[in-house]
A protein has these predicted regions:
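Hydrophobic adenine-recognition pocket in adenosine-nucleotide-binding enzymes
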Residues: 28, 99-101
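C-terminal "cap" of GNAT-fold acetyltransferases
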Residues: 153-183
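Conserved active-site alpha-helix within GNAT-family acetyltransferase domains
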Residues: 124-128, 134-159
Length: 183
């Protein structure tokens, strides 16, 4: 469990309704499911189900709760989520997403912290690497880079500049290639 302090200039923007701490990060639990869906709906709307990333997640069926991270405010309400899925592309890897933060808690670094903690859990589990679809500008500070052209395919259209990966183990991506699908 990680608790983020409520002090600092960015925290003040969040308002007092979030309490004294910005968030406590925990592994995802079944009782978080309904609140996670509300956060995801608020962040992405109904269009989230049309994304190529959703096709990957549908094929896997269940996120990895011990690797996924949920941010709770002082009232124990879900205000952020970063989900991890076990997938395979030649070798076992992880697929990150969705990442979402309640609008009232955005701009405080919570999204990056959720990703950092989820990636640390993946690394501790002995994973080869993490793949995601997202903004290189957002994820680059965490070590993610664009997947080399033609190396990975997703089950649908994706902007190649938004297909990112992060190697967790030395030579973790040496045999990773092809379509990202179920493990």
């Amino acid at each position: 469990m990680l608790t983020l302090p409520a002090h600092g200039p960015k925290r003040r923007r969040l308002g007092t309704h979030l309490g004294t701490n910005l968030a406590t990060l925990v592994a995802e639990k079944p009782e978080h499911q309904e609140a996670i869906e509300r956060v995801l709906d608020g962040a992405f709307g109904p269009g989230r189900f049309a994304k190529t990333s959703e096709r990957v997640r549908e094929r896997v069926a269940v996120a990895e709760p011990l690797l996924s991270r949920v941010a709770l405010n002082d009232a124990k309400e879900v205000i952020g989520v970063c989900r991890i899925w076990r997938v395979k592309a030649g070798e076992p890897i992880y697929f990150l997403g969705p990442l979402a933060v309640d609008p009232a808690a955005q701009l405080a670094g919570l999204g990056l912290t959720l990703v950092r903690e989820a990636v640390a859990a993946c690394r501790a589990s002995g994973g080869n690497g993490v793949v995601l679809v997202g903004s290189e500008r957002f994820f680059k500070p965490l070590g993610f880079s664009v997947v080399p052209a033609g190396r990975l395919r997703l089950p649908g259209a994706v902007d190649p500049a938004r297909l990112l990966w992060l190697e967790l183990a030395r030579n973790g991506f040496s045999n990773v290639q092809g379509e990202v699908g179920p493990p």
